[in-house]
A protein has these predicted regions:
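Nucleic-acid modification enzymes, centered on SAM-dependent nucleic-acid methyltransferases
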Residues: 1-39, 53-299, 315-346, 360, ...
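Hydrophobic/aromatic ligand-binding patch that stacks against planar heteroaromatic rings
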Residues: 50-51, 392
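Short glycine-dipeptide loop
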Residues: 34-35, 332, 363, 368-374
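Conserved beta-strand signature within the Rossmann-like core of class I S-adenosyl-L-methionine
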Residues: 336-340, 372-378
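A short glycine-rich, Lys/Arg-flanked "PGG" loop and its adjoining helix->strand segment in the class I
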Residues: 354-370, 395
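Class I SAM-dependent methyltransferase "Motif I" SAM/SAH-binding loop
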Residues: 42-46
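Hydrophobic beta-strand segment of the Class I
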Residues: 306-307
Length: 446
């Protein structure tokens, strides 16, 4: 199978390791008919659920990560484009009026006030101020002036309720620990932290429902860009974004104007909403629950098909840790101790990972109808991790039927910079054989 580029409906938010929508959709169409029930026990951002619902299937997703569940459910239930655009404009106008003075510089062309778009830094030293002038429409950049430095140093009050807490130093936070970063607010410049918190407060004033949820997720989708984690790349490195799967503070970095980049993100969210609505959303055929898939709340033999992309183990992506900043700003808490992962910094060893996979796939076997199919996508170069996956599926009672490579549309930055990183996923198709009995249900502690 060959992956295609992502359709606009997934532009709402970044999520690590997301599988290509066309591969998921093709698999669902191949193994089910409309009206069938499709399960994803590691549903993540909800691609299986969205593609299944779009194709007229009932969907059931489960994930321990509350951020993932909120993203999946929001994607299934978008607001109307007009309502979202109107509320977004109100939020942006309100916060821009309160923070414009924090992002002002002088235009080199006409000497009038211009809007700071970004500021380049080398360590703590301000190197370059980039701007766009609303008066003469010029875009430019200059070395920082005394005025630029004075504005950047302003200590305006932090809004009440601004999200913050001590950082849990798991695997993906070690670069921060070595830099002496201790609290999440330390990732931001002062003015960016204040502005991001004002955006959040303005969004929370929106009446509850899909508009507010999509605005909140548009903000969390922007959060990394509002921190000091955005490298000041040059050349063909692409736009400013969170490019590597860890928290870090690059030596050369950019301070981006939060309102400017939130407005850009809103445009992407609006594109996603329009694509989803054109595909038939909001969908009412199911959703994602925050639950442990080692104890699925589903009846025996009640599912027609399973499609899932389990956590990779070994040195794979730490989904829970990489969602912690997003969860903080959504006022969500995760139970990281139950995560199916390998993480020596949180004392989750390979046995914990293998046991977790085994418990989930036993439950998949229990709820899948005899003679039906399960598709698993997986990528890892560690034979021990592959052995854990295959043992989990086979010990649960599944029979491997076929495998095929899934070629990606483009390599990630991690794949480009790390020769040992897997270059393609494998697609594995299993069957629950037609036989009497089902795998016994197991609790999360088994």
């Amino acid at each position: 199978m060959s992956a295609e580029t992502w359709p606009p409906r997934y532009k709402l938010h970044k999520y690590w390791g997301r599988k290509p929508a066309n591969v998921v959709a093709r698999s669902i169409e191949m193994f089910t008919e409309p009206g069938a029930t499709v399960l994803d026990p590691f549903s993540g951002s909800g691609v299986t659920l969205v593609e299944g619902a779009r194709l007229g299937r009932r969907v059931a997703g489960f994930d321990l990560n509350p951020f993932a569940a909120r993203l999946a459910n929001a994607t299934l239930s978008p607001p109307s484009p007009a309502d979202f655009e109107a509320e977004a404009r109100r939020v942006i106008a309100e916060v821009r009026s309160r923070t414009a003075h924090l992002y002002t510089t002088s235009c080199d062309a006409c000497s009038k006030d211009a809007v700071v778009r970004s500021v380049g830094y080398a360590g703590d030293a301000m190197i370059e101020v980039r701007y766009r002038c609303p008066a003469c429409k010029a875009s430019g950049a200059h070395a920082p002036t005394s005025r630029d430095r004075e504005i950047a140093a302003l200590r305006v009050p932090v809004p009440e309720g601004a999200p913050d807490e001590d950082i849990l130093f798991g695997w993906e936070m070690q670069k921060l620990k070595r830099k002496g970063v201790r609290r999440w607010s330390d990732l931001f410049t002062h003015r960016n932290y204040v502005t991001a918190a004002l955006l959040r407060r303005a969004i929370l004033d929106v009446a509850g429902g899909p508009c507010r949820e999509w605005l909140l997720l548009s903000l969390t989708a922007s959060l990394a860009q509002l921190t000091r984690m955005i490298a000041d790349f040059s050349g063909d490195a692409g736009g400013p974004s969170w490019k590597i799967n860890c928290y870090w503070l690059p030596k050369s970095w950019q301070e981006l104007n939060p309102v400017w980049y939130f407005e850009n993100r809103v445009g992407k969210s609006l594109s996603a909403i329009r694509d989803l609505v054109a595909a038939g959303a909001p969908f009412a055929q199911g959703g994602c629950a925050v639950a442990d898939s080692r104890a699925l709340p589903l009846a025996d033999a009640s599912v027609d098909y399973v499609f899932t992309d389990p956590p990779y183990g070994g040195e794979g992506i730490q989904y829970g840790e990489l969602s912690m900043l997003w969860c903080l700003w959504l006022a969500e808490r995760q139970d990281l101790s139950a995560e199916v992962a390998y993480n020596p910094f949180r004392k989750l060893d390979h046995a914990h990972y293998a046991s977790g996979l085994g418990g989930v796939f036993r439950e998949c076997h229990r709820v899948l109808k005899p003679g039906k199919w399960m598709t698993v996508t997986f990528a890892n170069k560690d034979p021990l991790v592959w052995s854990a996956l295959m043992a989990a599926c086979e010990d649960a009672g599944f029979a491997l039927v076929t495998t095929a490579p899934m070629r990606r549309s483009a390599p990630s930055l991690t794949e480009t910079n790390m020769p040992a990183a897997p270059k393609e996923d494998m697609v594995l198709v299993f069957e629950r054989p037609r036989r009497s009995g089902v795998a016994p249900a197991r609790g999360p502690s088994d």
